Swiss-Prot record:
Binds 2 Zn(2+) ions per subunit. This is Peptidase T. The keyword Hydrolase applies. Coiled coil: none annotated. Its main location: cytoplasm. The lineage of its organism: Bacteria, Bacillati, Bacillota, Clostridia, Eubacteriales. Zn(2+) 1 binds at H78, D141, D198. It is found in: Cytoplasm. The active site is at D80, E175 (proton acceptor). Pfam families: M20_dimer (PF07687), Peptidase_M20 (PF01546). Belongs to the peptidase M20B family. It comes from Clostridium botulinum (strain Hall / ATCC 3502 / NCTC 13319 / Type A). It comes from the Bacteria. GO terms for biological process: peptide catabolic process; proteolysis.
């Protein structure tokens, strides 16, 4: 599995950042270009039925080498990197045999990965770790996943003594902007179940995600010359502030954890005449999720009642649901991943995803898809890192899962 590092370092050289603003599919041309390169690589290692469609979805097949019928399994990762920080000119560095101290990422800018801020890195003392130069994200989310899947497929091709059923491979665009499953053709993919490799640290096995919605709040004010504004002006900036303060101050990402939900204010655009607030709403529990959506609408209603006119409009749109609802119906998909980890000396860590993956939506599209670790930490930022051994073990895990299904 040693090839996984070389692959990963090659993939992150390609800028595949997705865009919140774009209406194209995929949202950036570089993703489509990268998809074509991956398609060529999949053909080169010997996969069959390789396709790259106009939307940037890559699919391929590793044919079964056994006679009996077993479930067709899929392995999926996404090609885009987060818009939160630049993915251009990524300049990675390998910290060999990490010594357990702070890591200076960029001496000139005094950017330091500090162990008191990111203590999880101490779990990898003595290992080789890939870090950034402090100017960009790393792209382990999710190019580590891509490298692991392709490395595992090549290993299975080169080791026919390892028995496996039919395996499908899929790479998606635009996961980071919530569109990864928009044009995913589940029927064409042809798997009975799948796994995304889009998780964090080694051992993570995730079969629960948030229920997710987004809310856009439009506030219509009225501007009047401030010298004669009494009883006439409606300042949308102040109304926006009122709206923000009417939601629970402690139910925000920075004050919640585990199974706790939140309202997250993403952006504010405001002036006297008009204001716009953009929120995301998250909760694991479906009932609480529905209550949160009603709660944010109710804030708008109360403000409208106070002003005795419709100055606030709240539009809520569901994004994805907790995949646990669907995965519980085929629990063996989690059990096999759990057993596979144990078989290769990894302690499984069953944790809820405080976020979403392509698997969230795919599970509701008829393809149950829990999430496996890809190995990285601190995604979407300059402090992102990935231990080399974690990537190697993720590739080994893919092989072992395929083997266990063949032996069911």
């Amino acid at each position: 599995m040693k090839d996984v590092l070389e692959r990963f370092l090659g993939y992150i050289k390609v800028d595949t950042q997705s865009s919140e603003e774009s209406d194209t599919v995929p949202t950036t041309k570089t993703q489509l270009e990268f998809a074509k390169k991956l398609g060529e690589e999949l053909k080169a290692i010997g996969l069959k039925d390789v396709s790259v469609d106009e939307n940037g979805y890559v699919m391929a097949t590793l044919e079964s080498n056994i006679d009996k019928k077993v479930p067709t399994i899929g392995f999926i990762a996404h090609m885009d990197t987060s818009p939160d920080l630049s993915g251009t000119n990524i300049n990675p560095r390998i910290v060999e045999k990490y010594d357990g101290q702070d890591i200076v990422l960029n001496k000139e800018k005094n950017i330091v990965l500090k162990i008191n801020e990111f203590p999880e890195i101490l779990e990898y003392k003595g290992q080789d770790i890939v870090v950034t130069d402090g100017n960009t994200l790393l792209g382990a989310d999710d190019k580590a996943g891509i490298a692991e899947i392709i490395t595992a497929m090549e290993y299975l091709i080169n080791h026919p003594e390892i028995k496996h059923g039919t395996i499908k491979v899929g790479f998606t665009p635009d996961e980071e902007v919530g569109k990864g499953a928009d044009h995913f053709d589940v029927k064409k993919f042809g798997a009975d179940l799948a796994y995304t490799l889009d998780g964090g640290g080694i051992g993570e096995l995730e079969c629960e995600t948030f229920n997710a919605a987004k809310a856009k709040v439009i506030i219509e004010g009225r501007n009047v010359h401030p010298g004669s504004a009494k009883n006439k002006m409606t300042n949308a900036v102040l109304v926006a502030n009122k709206f923000i303060n009417m939601l629970p101050e402690n139910e925000v990402p920075e004050r919640t954890e585990g199974y706790e939900g939140f309202f997250h204010l993403l952006s504010v655009k405001s002036e006297v005449e008009t204001a716009e607030l953009n929120y995301i709403i998250r909760d694991f529990d479906r009932k609480k999720f529905e209550e949160r959506k009603e709660q944010i609408k109710e804030v708008g209603k109360k403000i409208n009642e106070e002003y005795n006119k419709e100055i606030v409009c709240v539009k809520v749109e569901d994004q994805y649901y907790n995949m646990k609802e669907k995965i519980d119906e085929v629990k063996y998909v989690v059990d096999i991943a759990y057993d596979a980890m144990k078989a290769i000396d990894i302690e499984p860590i069953l944790v809820p995803i405080r976020g979403g993956t392509d698997g969230s939506r795919l599970s509701f599209m008829g393809l149950p898809t829990p999430n496996l670790f890809a190995g990285g930490h601190n995604f979407h930022g300059r402090f992102e890192f990935v231990p080399v051994l974690s990537m190697e073990k993720a590739a080994e895990l893919v092989v072992k899962i395929a083997e266990l299904y063949a032996n069911r």
